[in-house]
Amino acid sequence: MGEEAIVLYPAPPIGHLVSMVELGKTILSKNPSLSIHIILVPPPYQPESTATYISSVSSSFPSITFHHLPAVTPYSSSSTSRHHHESLLLEILCFSNPSVHRTLFSLSRNFNVRAMIIDFFCTAVLDITADFTFPVYFFYTSGAACLAFSFYLPTIDETTPGKNLKDIPTVHIPGVPPMKGSDMPKAVLERDDEVYDVFIMFGKQLSKSSGIIINTFDALENRAIKAITEELCFRNIYPIGPLIVNGRIEDRNDNKAVSCLNWLDSQPEKSVVFLCFGSLGLFSKEQVIEIAVGLEKSGQRFLWVVRNPPELEKTELDLKSLLPEGFLSRTEDKGMVVKSWAPQVPVLNHKAVGGFVTHCGWNSILEAVCAGVPMVAWPLYAEQRFNRVMIVDEIKIAISMNESETGFVSSTEVEKRVQEIIGECPVRERTMAMKNAAELALTETGSSHTALTTLLQSWSPK
């Protein structure tokens, strides 16, 4: 048989892809003799956001090969009934199964495939992996607490017949603090949601895998990890995180990155609040204005990544017309506003940054932890409200941005939280402790290194 290989199958969004690539790099660092093959389904939106990244990885890591599948057009691509991106994503992945099967067949003929690792969203591929002999693992790109929820969701469904999660006052999940039903992942809040039953099925399928790899570490989510193995009775979990991108600046954004970092060089230590909300984090024009007013009133130094509102997403971003009149000139001594993108990891690791206003995407949380930067939690979509409860109430490395019932955040609230996170905030010390714990987990005797070693040994020829 040919060269030994590991096949990775990420979900298309950039955050999922980056996490899976980091997993591939980590596997290679421990076993360079392996080759990594990543199967790519074209993303249904913003395909340009992944193209340059993929090119960069390909040129830097010759042992990582990307296999691009043809684009598919799902039935719901033009549907107005879809109210979150998960439904489109799941349909595209399901429609891609025939192409995935052909790719796996080809890889199996040319390589000795030791294992396949799939994203949680790619569960539909289990329908075809039974045709092959290699073991299949899940890679869960959110935290262990969210994984515990996914395991327990079928039980919640059975024990609360007819009830929508959003209407349940308190939900109890093993290893997770009690939280409001409305804080559960958005896709499962209502039973008549088009993907609700799919997520129930996902929860039931988890235990059918050979194991689950989680991008977390024991000290960060010890209670949730323990609950999965003991209360939910699934022992083959491998918390091998934190897996985050390094601080290297992507070539396409060199000028913008250098500009951000040069500006930070001129700021006092731990004086700057960094506001960044991910590739899908969009605000209405009214909310953008409210953020601007709050930042100006706070008097704090800030670096703010601004994207176009949804209604203007396809137009050129004009900061002067989007922001309050005169805002840029009035705040130029204390603030910097950048369009669409900033080098998040280098920014978070800069000594001038003292706080991070984040959408609570799991990658961003881990990046902040590894940089020792406390967070202001402002969730926007997917499982981010769930993550907020975890980092505010359980792990205590963030404070919460409070919103109205409609999700709107006032300028006064922005002002208060920005001032609080830069001041003598109690979560700062806790965040630094977690930074140290993350570093320890990756050492030779650390929990994550041990979990990864155990996983790799299971793939070795018997």
UniProtKB/Swiss-Prot annotation:
Q: Is Nucleus given among the entry's keywords? A: no
Short name of one Pfam family: UDPGT
CDD domains xrefs: GT1_Gtf-like
Question: What cystine linkages occur within this chain?
Answer: none
Binding-site positions, UDP-alpha-D-glucose: 279, 342-344, 359-367, 381-384
EC identifiers of the protein:
2.4.1.-
Name the UniProt key words of this record, in alphabetical order. Answer: Glycosyltransferase, Transferase
Task: Give the GO molecular function terms.
Answer: quercetin 3'-O-glucosyltransferase activity; quercetin 3-O-glucosyltransferase activity; quercetin 4'-O-glucosyltransferase activity; quercetin 7-O-glucosyltransferase activity
Per the record, its GO cellular-component terms are:
cytosol
Q: Which InterPro entries match?
A: UDP-glycosyltransf_plant, UDP_glucos_trans, UDP_glycos_trans_CS
The record, for Gene3D superfamilies, names: Glycogen Phosphorylase B
Family in the record: Belongs to the UDP-glycosyltransferase family.
Task of the protein: Possesses low quercetin 3-O-glucosyltransferase, 7-O-glucosyltransferase, 3'-O-glucosyltransferase and 4'-O-glucosyltransferase activities in vitro.
Please identify the protein, giving its name as recorded: UDP-glycosyltransferase 88A1
Q: Give the organism's phylogenetic lineage.
A: Eukaryota, Viridiplantae, Streptophyta, Embryophyta, Tracheophyta
